[in-house]
Amino acid sequence: MINRYKNQKISYIWNDQNKFDTWKKVQETYVKTLEEEGVAKPGISEKIASVSVEAEEVYEREKVTNHDLASFVDILQNKVGEGSNWIHYGLTSSDVVDTSNSLLIKESLEVLLKLVDDLLNEIKNRAIDEQNTKIIGRTHGVFAEETFLGNILGNWYLEIKRNLDRLSTAKETISYGKLSGPVGNYTVVTPEIEDKTLKKLNLKSEKFASQIVSRDRYAEVFSAISILASSYDRIAGNLRSYQRSEISEIFEPFKDGQKGSSAMPHKKNPIGSERISGLSRIIRGYSISSLENMVLWNERDISNSSVERIIIPDSFNIICFMTTELTSIIKNMVINHEQINKNLENAKNKSISQRVLSVLVNNGIDRDNAYRSIQSLIFENNSAEELIKAIEEEFDIDLSNITNSENEIGNNDSFLDKFN
């Protein structure tokens, strides 16, 4: 991952040294269980814990073995010395790699979940602040009816909350490891030893395993991340729309000294939201790769491995960066209430059309006849007052209450309850 989009915690989790340290943790925990079960002599796990395997050592050994896990095991055994034959006893590479991956993905999800929770708090705070701010709603990019800005933000909040729930479920789905050997049939290691070892690591056993932890588990994680990224893309796209010159209702924060363009000094571009939209495309592509990784031959092949070395750390770095970026935008975005009110006024003759239609229908006028008349008159009259007067004259009906503030917009009394 390029430095521009790195998250410090995620980068640490997925750096090679931490990966090798996690492999060592799995080996140490496994040997500890062998000791407790009387299979291995006591003290070997302590020796494993006391030594370190440096990334550079693995790189150098891999030049000979062409296998990173085998290189790691060679170095670890050499450093432990007597009793090291119990290291990797009865295991295959995927037992260590996949169990470690589950630990690292879980840890990454915990980082992401905290960031998403912070984002939710910011959205909720802004929604509460703007719960009574009227704004013109738009469907298909066209004026529709008035709504509350707080409702729009509340809609975003609940969507992100559903994403939080999906990520939590995915965390449970990925909390599985395996120590059942080359094809998952416990040739050497017993199910009891596997269960006890994985329990110490806060993982569960993959039942009916092949050589690997099933990749549908990975696909669920990256599908959840992809949905989250797409939710961010939707929010970012709307923020970009609000910042259009002809709308100018909501603006991203613009720092002192910032330049919006190298050529045009007047420019204040929504670069943060645009960045989120761009990065979401990468995340969605990676989720497709994770689905492709489900399709492996028989008990496994390694066509998934090269893909995962890229998409796992990159996905977590990018989605955490996106979350932090969107949190900052939401927290600091500038809401132009004056322009919001101007746009409301400009849209008034259109935003009342359904209310006028309902009044006419309630007074016994044929719905289609009323609809066609309103449709025609709206395009002939530029203001709400002119429209109402024309309709009153055509249908001999009193519409004086249509533009009363109490009738202009729906009920918002239960606003705070909707966050629960």
Describe each PLM feature range.
Residues 1, 76-93, 189-208, 289, ...:
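Acidic, low-complexity proline/glycine-rich segments
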Residues 55-80:
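N-terminal low-complexity, intrinsically disordered segments
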Residues 1-26, 36-39, 46, 50, ...:
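Glycine-rich cofactor/substrate-binding loops
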Residues 28-29, 70-71, 99-103, 160, ...:
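A generic alpha-helix surface/boundary motif
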